[in-house]
Design a protein with these regions (language model features):
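N-terminal capping/lid subdomain adjacent to the active-site entrance of alpha/beta enzymes
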Residues: 36-234, 240-248, 252-256
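Catalytic beta/alpha-barrel core
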Residues: 188, 208-215, 238-239, 259-268, ...
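Catalytic alpha/beta core domains of metabolic enzymes, predominantly
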Residues: 269-274, 278-303
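N-terminal export signals
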Residues: 5-6, 12-34
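Acidic, glycine-rich loop-and-beta core segments that form the ion-binding/anion-interacting portion
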Residues: 238-279
Length: 303
């Protein structure tokens, strides 16, 4: 109970600090540190008129350095849309990425652009970017899907608010960046020579690797990477293992190779099989494709 109260008190304090910063023209960094003076934050009312938010978006094709292969698909490009939300001269940036094999869940380029046009037409009704929950709830209500487009707006809005407060979000949330989990670098399925090259490129820059599996060359992939580095490895099978006994055998073998976690070992429709694998696995098993929205988590109880 104390933890819940502490979290609520932290939220209340951060909210108060943010508005204190806005009212005084101080950055939230200075308010949190108790400083009495700081560079001007931004002018809420430059021209005597309350500013409105504006949204812009720019579709483009992201070209990859290497062919990127997962269990069911290979690609050399990714359809993308850059999203910008501007408020009083400050711009927050977001991105909608639509890998072809996930477009049923995330949306296509056409559907993303159509949804962002809807948002562009209505976002001006909000004059306060700090109403994050209200704005994002309203945008979510505009359609049942369009996850990629909604994510891009969410990211851009948070980026905007962080810039308005002149603070990164780990500070706004009261976190210690030194305690943040390490991010992974993903290595797609490929030939041994290419996998070896990719591993050499990234091994000195990251604390943990993420490796795509789910095809017949899974063991060759891991053996090749292990010939280059002994870094911890997270595995993402992208639903590629169809048989639960095969999946469990692979997980036991992977544990011997220093793998630390397994992501989405089997198709999301095979919930009973995934639950069986999770219950037997010597490594933690995480969902990926099985969770697109918060409501999906309920269906994964005990899985």
């Amino acid at each position: 109970m104390n933890t819940i109260n502490d979290m609520q008190n932290r939220r209340d304090f951060l909210k108060t600090a943010a508005f204190a910063a806005l009212g005084s023209g101080m950055a939230i960094n200075s308010v949190l540190a108790g400083e009495g003076a700081a560079p001007a934050l931004f002018n809420i009312n430059k021209s005597g008129v309350t500013p409105k938010m504006k949204l812009r978006f720019f579709p483009y094709e992201l070209r990859l350095r290497h062919v990127f292969t997962v269990a069911a698909y290979s690609r050399t490009t990714t359809p993308d849309v850059q999203v910008e939300i501007e408020y009083d001269g400050i711009i927050g940036y977001g991105e909608a990425s639509m890998p072809p094999y996930l477009q049923h869940e995330l949306g296509t380029m056409d559907s993303v652009l159509a949804f962002l046009k809807k948002v562009q037409d209505v976002i001006g009704q909000f004059s306060d970017p700090f109403r994050l929950e209200d704005i994002l709830s309203y945008i979510d209500s505009l359609s049942a899907g369009d996850s990629a487009a909604k994510t891009a707006v969410d990211i851009a809005l948070h980026d905007l608010v962080g810039k308005l407060l002149q603070a990164p979000w780990y500070k706004i949330w009261g976190l210690d960046k030194e305690k943040a989990p390490s991010t992974t670098f993903t290595i797609g399925i490929d030939t041994p020579d290419v996998v070896r090259e990719k591993t050499k490129e990234c091994a000195g820059q990251f604390n943990i690797l993420k490796v795509k599996l789910g095809r017949d060359n899974d063991k060759e992939m891991i053996e090749t990477i292990r010939s280059v580095t002994d870094l911890p490895i997270a595995i993402d099978a992208n639903q590629g293992w169809k048989d639960k006994h095969y999946a469990l055998d692979m997980i036991h073998w992977l544990k011997e190779k220093g793998i630390v976690m397994i992501e989405q070992p089997m198709p999301k429709e095979q919930l009973d099989d995934i639950a069986w694998v999770t219950g037997q696995s010597p490594l933690p098993v995480f969902a990926d494709e099985s969770v697109q929205r918060l409501k999906d988590i309920v269906g994964l109880k005990d899985v």
